[in-house]
Amino acid sequence: MRLHHLLLVLFFVVLSAGSGFTHGVTDSLSCRWKKGICVLTRCPGTMRQIGTCFGPPVKCCRLK
């Protein structure tokens, strides 16, 4: 069972290193991890854009 926990931790380390923390948000999963939501048009007035979800038309927004 400990081996499963070790493999799970290694898996997350590899994913986090490969995702590139310096790059912007580019999918809905990383948008949620950064406490944002995907919005089809513009971000509402109380939110700011932190990236995109599924491409340019869908924005990732988070509270200011």
UniProtKB/Swiss-Prot annotation:
InterPro entries: Beta/alpha-defensin_C, Defensin_beta-like. GO terms for molecular function: CCR6 chemokine receptor binding; chemoattractant activity. Belongs to the beta-defensin family. Keywords: Antibiotic, Antimicrobial, Defensin, Disulfide bond, Secreted, Signal. Transmembrane segments: none annotated. GO terms for biological process: cell chemotaxis; defense response to bacterium. The keyword Signal applies. This is Beta-defensin 2. It is found in: Secreted. Disulfide bonds join 31-60, 38-53, 43-61. GO terms for cellular component: extracellular space. Has bactericidal activity. Residues 1-22 form the signal peptide. It comes from the Eukaryota. PANTHER family: BETA-DEFENSIN, DEFENSIN BETA 4A.
